[in-house]
Amino acid sequence: LFRSVLDGKVGLEMAKRLEGKGILMLASMEGGFRNMINNKKPVSSPADVSGVKYRVMQNPVFIDMFNSMGGSAVPMAWGETFTAVQQGTIDGLEIPLAVIDASKYFEVTKFLSLTNHTYSAIHLLVSKRTFDKLSPDQRKAVVDAAKQSLAEQRKASADNARQLVATLQSK
């Protein structure tokens, strides 16, 4: 579904708007889905967020989303988050599986809930001015490399997500 959005009309409109700002979008890669981890309870429905203090990005959309589900959104700088979970200042947070694993959040949280509540795209962008300075052969090589890397990155992202689910659920 998300790939069809990024590769379809929405993605084309986004690319068109960016180009109007002097930026070319070469590809929309996957950052994966964000999931919830906490020390209070598993989350299988929005109602389960109620009563749980979640670290969220300092962004009104995320703050409103968690507060509207009955949780307590705690905007917090990323660098403070691990210690805040460890000390009980917050109960949990929402992040991609790869970050849960790499940052070892499984060591300080009890519940991993595969909520997939937010999808993160990673856009491969280049300045139009810089791109236009390249020779036609160089431009073709850049576009071809972007297309090839897109397919490889999306496959690797999906494979990595499957592996991380198994790894994290075993911890």
Whereabouts are the PLM-identified features?
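N-terminal secretory/targeting leader peptides
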Residues: L1-F2, K9-K171
